[in-house]
């Protein structure tokens, strides 16, 4: 017997943000560590090039992707990790995903203001 009004879940959009964050972290963070942690301090990449890239529309898009999506992945892991440890935070989904949404809005306006 099928239900006439199935309950909608918020999991698909949250899992989308979680998986995007994990994928972007795995692909981009090693490159960022190489550029910002090794090549920049050694003087092999000029700071002016990084700043110029950050001021382009593509650079801003990269900064947004590298900062927003991993936050969603991290908050999703914290939320489900606490649940797995039987620590039930009141309205945990609203708190963790709400903080991620607030962070996303703040980062969006900060990057646009670059």
Curated annotation (Swiss-Prot):
GO terms for biological process: fumarate metabolic process. NCBIfam families: PRK05470.1-1. The keyword rRNA-binding does not apply. This is Fumarate reductase subunit D. It is found in: Cell inner membrane. Gene3D superfamilies: Fumarate reductase/succinate dehydrogenase, transmembrane subunit. Part of an enzyme complex containing four subunits: a flavoprotein (FrdA), an iron-sulfur protein (FrdB), and two hydrophobic anchor proteins (FrdC and FrdD). Coiled coil: none annotated. Anchors the catalytic components of the fumarate reductase complex to the cell membrane, binds quinones. It comes from the Bacteria. Its main location: membrane. The chain crosses the membrane at residues 27-47, 50-70, 94-114. It is a multi-pass membrane protein. The keyword Cell inner membrane applies. GO terms for molecular function: succinate dehydrogenase activity. Keywords: Cell inner membrane, Cell membrane, Membrane, Transmembrane, Transmembrane helix. GO terms for cellular component: fumarate reductase complex; plasma membrane. InterPro entries: Fumarate_red_D, SQR/QFR_C/D. Belongs to the FrdD family.
């Amino acid at each position: 017997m099928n239900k006439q009004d199935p309950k909608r879940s918020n999991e698909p959009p949250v899992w989308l943000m979680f998986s995007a964050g994990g994928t972007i972290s795995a692909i981009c963070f090693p490159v960022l560590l190489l550029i910002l942690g090794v090549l920049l301090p050694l003087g092999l990449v000029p700071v002016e090039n990084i700043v110029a890239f950050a001021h382009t529309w593509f650079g801003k898009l990269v900064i947004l992707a590298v900062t927003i999506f991993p936050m969603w992945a991290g908050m999703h892991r914290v939320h489900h990790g606490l649940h797995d440890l039987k620590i039930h935070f009141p309205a945990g989904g609203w708190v963790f995903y709400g903080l991620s949404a607030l962070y996303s809005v703040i980062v969006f306006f900060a990057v646009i203001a670059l």
